[in-house]
Structure formats: structure tokens, C-alpha cells
Amino acid sequence: MDRSGLVTGVKQGTCQISKKDMTYQVDVRHLEQRENGTYVDGILIVNKSYPLSADYDPGLQPETKAAFQELCDAAAAEGMDIYDGSDYRDYSYQVKIYHNYCSLYGWEKADTFSARPGYSEHQSGLTIDCNTIDDAFGETQEAAWLAEHCADYGFIIRFPKGKEAITGYKYEPWHIRYVGADVAKEIQKYGLTLEEYLGVDSVYAEPWQ
């Protein structure tokens, strides 16, 4: 258990943790390393601790695309204009994006809002940036609708406000990740990040070289 209370298991099963006079029952999740990346209980995790292979090139996943279309249709029915501003990016494209930000802001600042090559969720084909990549989007009715309803279509707000120390990235109200409706609703219900739900961290092993 770390200082924030995050518990990481080393094998599948359950464990019991006691703190002072309080006892908690904790599920231990199953972490599996596959050829393209790391899965926790069957969910692909991509963050600063868990990269994808450079040659992983799935494009936008069909299930993600279909679910997003349903989301957009539902939003439109309520007078909202939500659209795909950016989705899949391959490794080489992320190299260009990250290096450009590093040249403009330095790698320490870039790391707060841009993923290093191989560490971007966009390469998974499970992530979509809605509308415009602009902090002002967070003040729109579309952003409010997205935060309230995206879980119904299997998406989560991947980098929520106030969770920067956990996700490793600044708040991005436009950035949604497909995890399936059951998981998304549970994450939304308890106000979790994907890291908290899966019991993993998001920290680069070393400074950018």
C-alpha cells in the first residue's frame, strides 16, 4: 500500500489489509503481459508505467468507433455537437508530436500533457479526443454532457480534474477512453481513474533522454 492508499497485488486472489482497528477486503487483480502491451483483468492499460510496442498498429478499434457513433447520435438528439477531433495515432506520429512539445516547452512540462512515444493511449485505438483540444472545451455544454453520459456508451474521462498526481497528466475533458459500459459505469460511480480501478501507477521509470 502506498501513501495514497493504493494497493497493488502480486498474484491473483484476495487479500486482507488491516490498519489500526479497521479491516478492508481487497480484490487482487490479474496482470498479464501480452505481445502488444499489459492487460489487467483483460483491460489494456497504457500510461507512463505501461507502454505499447512500437509496432502495435491497430487503427481505431471497431468497437470503439461504433460506441462513439452511438454516443454522438445520443448527444445530437439532445442538441449537443460532439464529434471526433482526433483518435488513433501510430508510434511514429507520436514521436513528432512529443518532440515538438519538448522543443517548445521542455520535456518536464511536455510530460504533463503529452505522452512519450509508445506511452500514448491513442496508439491503442481505444481513445478519442472529442471536439477541440482546448481547456475552454471544459466549460461547454458538450463537455458537461460527455462527463455525465459517456459511461453509458462504455467511455470514461481518462484524465479527470484533481487526479493529476495519479494519472500523470493534466485534466483533459475532451479525452475519452473506451473500456466497455460495465467498467465505465463502475469507474464513474466511484469517481475513480483507470489507474485506481486497476490498481496500477503511472510514473515514467526515468527522465526523458
Regions found by a protein language model. Give the residues of each.
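Extracytoplasmic cell-surface/polysaccharide-interacting catalytic and binding patches
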Residues: 22-209
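Extracytoplasmic soluble-region selector
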Residues: 1-31
